[in-house]
């Protein structure tokens, strides 16, 4: 159980430090193309591998540029994380584009459209009472 807590702590620290490095440490302009945020960090039990999930707000071309920039900065980030976290061996980093927020926004948009259509048709919505038929 202590091993699990350590992995969680390391993941939280990696998320914090990587967020800081995204703002102040990486000079590659590609990384600053869109609004970039780290949504999740997964670290293997042996602390040798790390998946960092990134959400990028912007067009697909901007997302591609940001991911290319992050890929190019992987070695720098790994070295900085090893130094900042004082780890003997920093984990190997893999960046993954997280589309969860984008998918959630799409679902909310679709639900809004359905609600507007229902209102236009005059359909009965949840919470309204049906007229009594004697």
Swiss-Prot record:
Subcellular location: Cytoplasm
Alphabetized InterPro entries for the sequence: KH_dom-like_a/b (IPR015946), RbfA (IPR000238), RbfA_dom_sf (IPR023799), Ribosome-bd_factorA_CS (IPR020053)
Gene3D superfamilies per record: 3.30.300.20
GO molecular function, one term: ribosomal small subunit binding
Domain of life per record: Bacteria
GO biological process terms, semicolon-separated: maturation of SSU-rRNA
Similarity comment: family membership: Belongs to the RbfA family.
Database matches in SUPFAM superfamilies: Ribosome-binding factor A, RbfA
Protein name: Ribosome-binding factor A
GO CC annotations on file: cytosol
Organism taxonomic ancestry: Bacteria, Bacillati, Cyanobacteriota, Cyanophyceae, Synechococcales
Keywords for the protein's UniProt record, in alphabetical order: Cytoplasm, Ribosome biogenesis
Sections of the chain in a coiled coil: none
